[in-house]
Amino acid sequence: MNGRILLIIVLMLALLLPLTAAEGETSTLYVRKVENLPEDFIFGMDVSSVLAEERSGVKYYDFNGSEADLFRLLTDNGINYIRVRIWNNPYDDEGHGFGGGNCDIENAVEIGKRATACGMKLLADFHYSDFWADPAKQKAPKAWANLNFEDKKTALYQYTKQSLKAMKAAGIDIGMVQVGNETNGGLAGETDWAKMSQLFNAGSQAVRETDSNILVALHFTNPETSGRYAWIAETLHRHHVDYDVFASSYYPFWHGTLKNLTSVLTSVADTYGKKVMVAETSYTYTAEDGDGHGNTAPKNGQTLNYPVTVQGQANAVRDVIQAVSDVGEAGIGVFYWEPAWIPVGPAHRLEKNKALWETYGSGWATSYAAEYDPEDAGKWFGGSAVDNQALFDFKGRPLPSLHVFQYVDTGTPFKN
């Protein structure tokens, strides 16, 4: 009799195990509900490096521990938009890639096809450079280096239109196009705002002619700088720049308070009738380095208002979503930057990692990028600088913080 009871108990426990595992997966995370999120709010991710990662042998897994397609896993966890950066020609004369995912138009087309196959829209992020474009550098592509301004403007228009044509021909669902990346003070080598505005309009024209339903976004950063976004928005208005979305980067350890972010985005939205969003954000879940190449955070002097934990990471993402939502109807979404840029191998096998970074471009830069970007990539080339800000651990297993995009609509009923 005791044996039969024991057997029944064992069987009942076995039946409960899947439920217990699922509960355990979610109960480690607390997410406070964001009220009144619209159904079409963008939960986006930039996974520009994923093809280079996969070619380097990186694998991703679902919450059950089974190997999974990254795009299917993301859409199953609430992601509805994929962002991909596009560089004109990120290769040297011998065809060696500059790294950072070697993000040419072919890379964008493949990522776009996989995103579309999983029901997600694509944000095409044109840098109009052969490598990273950001506030520190906006270098023109090699092929445009000796063009006069009018020819450069024509080249930008044609390149944008041809690239979008290739993506449309591949059946990609393009929802938005970014004309430039973090263009605080430059675009394709131009720093005068009158000329930059003409370049913005050349890109915008190419988008409008391709598909009038595609949103045109312009992207800036450093919202913490007093008056910056008000000045930029007024300058764009004065130069009659045609765009729909004013996009901002927001990294909690660099870019000030969320209250300020909401305030400056609200001002742009209310004054000029623009949609607004966060095009890039991320946060650390560990201070550990996974691949032997140093990370951008945490570092001395940075403001870390959240714990460096998985829960802290989830809180940071949730609060950015809240900040954009607080703008009102004009606040359309948030993109997480490179959540899957994890180590190609452990830190203790650094030399093997270096070989993979050089061969497949799966680090932030290769040594070959030195000819184009000698002062930055030429000195600091290597692996992923954000593996500790990913939403996957160093072995490709999803962190509970990946669930935050699903939970913000409902919240979780418990707090640890």
Give the location of each predicted region.
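Bacterial N-terminal signal peptides
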Residues: 8-18
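N-terminal carbohydrate-binding accessory modules
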Residues: 23-79
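Aromatic-rich peripheral "rim/lid" segments of glycoside hydrolase catalytic domains that contact
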Residues: 28-29, 267, 286-318, 323, ...
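Conserved, mostly hydrophobic/aromatic
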Residues: 45, 74, 125, 177, ...
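Active-site beta-loop-alpha junctions enriched in small/polar residues
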Residues: 47-50, 87-89, 127-131, 179-184, ...
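Aromatic-lined substrate-binding rim segments of carbohydrate-active enzymes
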Residues: 66-133, 193-214, 261-271
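Glycoside hydrolase catalytic-domain groove-lining segments
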Residues: 69-71, 213-215, 228-302, 309-312, ...
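Active-site cleft segment of glycoside hydrolase catalytic domains centered on the general acid/base Glu
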Residues: 97, 102-107, 133-237, 241, ...
